[in-house]
């Protein structure tokens, strides 16, 4: 019996001809430093080959309609099962997705309310639950004799026939925010006081407004209430005006209809066709819960059926842990003949919900917008969705499943992985958390360093064996035998000596009113079990409140008070990937590339050849490679197969034309370098090459200090992991000079 996957000659990213056997039907953990090749082995080899080979078994017709992965750079991979990957950063769902739709728990609830509810007749009388609904028979009201059909599960869906007509099933309505229409009331209308008329409407609207009887040459604050009412809500009357064109200085007589400021925004919103157009309009809008459905997204008819005295929207507001108890009591509340059907529906609900409860998501309600969930919550939703079908013979590749998990929630995660193995599957996970690594059956450690210094298997065995292996770098930290060094903490008596940021909020989501104080000039950590309110406190309250206060806007509705003296900027540094543009590199994002271009433009070679700093841009400059247009690679369209990306045959991935090599920068140590030479170096080597360039050296040193010395300057940012992206964003901020305007910054 085959008991392992054989990998021979793996060369994905920085892997150096790796030969390794990965046990099947076990939990296998891949550990190592950031950039050591963990994800390259797990996702770039195991998942890529497992999924590709499964897809190749499908017909050509089917494969042409699917996104296919290219063959991994590996000599041989034997005995790899069909693979599923749970990525580190699941995509942020759209506005129509909720926790209930994402987990598909709402499907069971809609079926429950369709088949088992007390339904309301057209005259408002409720009928007791009956099997006639499941049989598709008409119902007759015993009180008024009205005949009607109970709603189907489809008619209870807010993304379909059950949607609220006012908000179209989104639960929110966009209305014009009057406070944004005149941001500076010291200006006159002629000077552009009415903002929508400047960006969304023709400039002649000020002339029409004047004909409506509004003074346009006095500050807006001095207008009468009647004049302001005309500006905001005036009637759409046609006026005869004399329009003076600013370009031709000619006057023209026109008949033009007056569009008040509010209607100008509403009209522009109705015509929005793309994201760019929406951005022009959204600054004049505010969101509020739909007044008709109260934010439930459901129509009045979809909210009518009741089970155990509650409607669908009411049970969707319950935390999942409470909802499970409520669902368990449904069969007993029904007539005897309906209980078998009720038990079947409730068992289906409970089976899916159990996985989510095991993963610590019992505090979430089904109506919670999926876009407001944290990364860890979305990843656990993804994990629960993948494991609920009880498949067998599948390879599950998990990329840092412990992200966002409190140590107390890790037991549930490990239990889910053990259940997968018990069902005959194999689990490969990439992680840094020693508590998760200790639960694995087998460990493979990559290293010894990162980037070019990594890509090798330095140790493998059981966690206990690695803890005693002198070649292992993570071994000493397993089973609590060692701990990472800690920085000295500020003393309690001086903790708030540099000032305080004070915040208080009302209830939001499942989080009760909060009050918190953050010391200025200190490193503050917000921690707690999943669902305790970390994201709500920081990302949904503190950050937007600071941004609004700095911009002079009203605080978010749920923020009661904010006291942040001296804070003039707030920077959010999260772990979301840095775009999808291959033209973005480590050098450009870390603000190094511009400095290098200026340096090379000052060289004698550049002056002799007539090159300016702009010519050294691989995106738009004269020296970019004409074959690949500065991307460093070209895409080959292969019929019936996935597109193949290969290094550009002319520049060999350097992004520059051969003429760029003729411009040399001479360091004080006598060495000369071209810009393509520097872009091919990793940060560690570039530090010594750029030792004479103060600004470049400082910014590269920050990257080195943050453990990113293994990245090459020309590395594409979309290829970076979430942790690497976060550290690069941090380096980008730390590399900026701390001028007076930057002292009042809050970094989150």
Question: What residue ranges belong to the model's regions?
Answer:
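Conserved phosphate-binding elements of NTP-dependent enzyme cores
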Residues: 1-745
């Amino acid at each position: 019996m085959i008991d392992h996957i054989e990998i021979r000659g793996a060369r994905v990213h920085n892997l150096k001809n790796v030969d390794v056997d990965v046990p099947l039907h076990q939990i296998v953990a891949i550990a190592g430093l950031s950039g050591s090749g963990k994800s390259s082995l797990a996702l770039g080899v195991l998942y890529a080959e497992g999924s590709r080979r499964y897809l190749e078994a499908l017909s050509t017709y089917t494969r042409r309609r699917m996104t296919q992965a290219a063959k991994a750079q590996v000599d041989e991979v034997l005995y790899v099962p069909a693979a599923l990957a749970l990525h580190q950063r699941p995509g942020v769902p759209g506005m129509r997705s909720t926790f209930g739709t994402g987990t598909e728990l709402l499907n069971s609830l809609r079926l429950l309310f369709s088949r088992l509810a007390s339904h309301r007749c057209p005259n408002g009388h409720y009928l007791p639950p009956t099997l006639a609904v499941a049989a598709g028979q008409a119902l007759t009201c015993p009180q008024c004799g009205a005949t009607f059909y109970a709603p189907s599960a489809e008619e209870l869906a807010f993304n379909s026939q059950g949607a609220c007509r006012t908000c179209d099933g989104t639960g929110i309505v966009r209305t014009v925010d009057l406070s944004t229409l005149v941001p500076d009331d010291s200006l006159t209308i002629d000077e552009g006081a009415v903002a929508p008329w400047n960006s969304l409407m023709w400039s002649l609207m000020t002339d029409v407004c004047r004909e409506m009887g509004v003074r346009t040459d006095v500050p807006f604050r001095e207008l009468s209430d009647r004049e302001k009412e005309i500006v905001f809500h005036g009637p759409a009357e046609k006026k005869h005006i004399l329009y003076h064109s600013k370009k031709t200085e000619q006057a023209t007589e026109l008949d033009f209809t007056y569009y008040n400021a509010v209607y100008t925004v509403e009209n522009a919103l109705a015509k929005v066709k793309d994201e760019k157009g929406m951005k022009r309009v959204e600054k004049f809008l505010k969101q509020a819960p739909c007044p008709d459905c109260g934010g439930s997204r459901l129509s009045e008819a979809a909210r009518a059926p009741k089970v155990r005295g509650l409607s669908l929207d009411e049970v969707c507001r319950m935390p999942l842990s409470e909802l499970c108890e409520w669902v368990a009591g449904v069969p007993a509340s029904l007539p005897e003949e309906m209980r078998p059907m009720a038990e079947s529906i409730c068992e289906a609900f409970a089976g899916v919900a159990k996985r989510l409860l095991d993963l610590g998501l019992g505090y979430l309600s089904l109506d919670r917008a999926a876009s407001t969930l944290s990364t860890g919550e979305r990843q656990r939703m993804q994990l629960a969705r993948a494991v609920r079908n009880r498949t067998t013979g599948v390879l599950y590749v998990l990329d840092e499943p412990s992200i966002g998990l409190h140590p107390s929630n890790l037991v549930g995660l490990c239990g889910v992985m053990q259940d997968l193995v018990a069902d005959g599957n194999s689990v490969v996970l990439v992680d840094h958390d020693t508590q998760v690594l200790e639960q694995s059956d087998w460990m493979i450690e990559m290293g010894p360093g990162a980037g070019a210094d990594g890509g090798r298997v330095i140790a493998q065995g059981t966690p206990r064996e690695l803890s005693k292996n002198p070649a292992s770098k993570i071994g000493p930290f397993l089973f609590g035998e060692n701990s990472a060094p800690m920085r000295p903490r500020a003393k309690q008596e001086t903790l708030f000596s540099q000032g305080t940021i004070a915040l208080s909020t009302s209830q939001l989501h499942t989080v009760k009113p909060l009050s918190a104080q953050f010391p200025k000039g200190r490193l503050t950590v917000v921690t707690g079990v999943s669902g305790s309110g970390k994201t709500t406190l920081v990302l949904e309250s503190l950050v937007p409140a600071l941004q609004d206060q700095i911009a002079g806007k009203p605080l978010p509705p749920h923020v009661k008070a904010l006291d942040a003296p001296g804070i003039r900027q707030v920077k959010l540094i999260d772990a979301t990937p840095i775009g999808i543009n291959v033209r973005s590199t480590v050098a450009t994002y870390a603000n190094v590339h511009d400095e290098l271009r200026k340096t090379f433009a000052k060289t004698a070679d550049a002056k002799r050849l007539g090159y300016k700093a702009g010519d050294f841009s691989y995106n738009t400059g004269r020296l970019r490679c004409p074959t690949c247009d500065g991307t460093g690679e070209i895409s080959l369209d292969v019929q019936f197969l996935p597109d193949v990306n290969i290094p550009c045959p002319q520049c060999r991935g350097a992004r520059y034309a051969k003429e760029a090599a003729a411009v040399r920068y001479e360091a004080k140590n006598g060495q000369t370098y071209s810009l393509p030479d520097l872009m091919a170096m990793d940060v560690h080597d570039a530090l010594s090459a750029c030792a004479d360039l103060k600004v470049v050296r400082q910014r590269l040193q920050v990257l080195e200090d943050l453990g990113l010395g293994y990245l090459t300057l020309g590395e594409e940012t979309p290829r970076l992991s979430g942790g690497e992206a976060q550290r690069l964003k941090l380096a980008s901020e730390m590399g900026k000079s701390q001028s007076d305007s930057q002292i009042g910054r809050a970094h989150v």
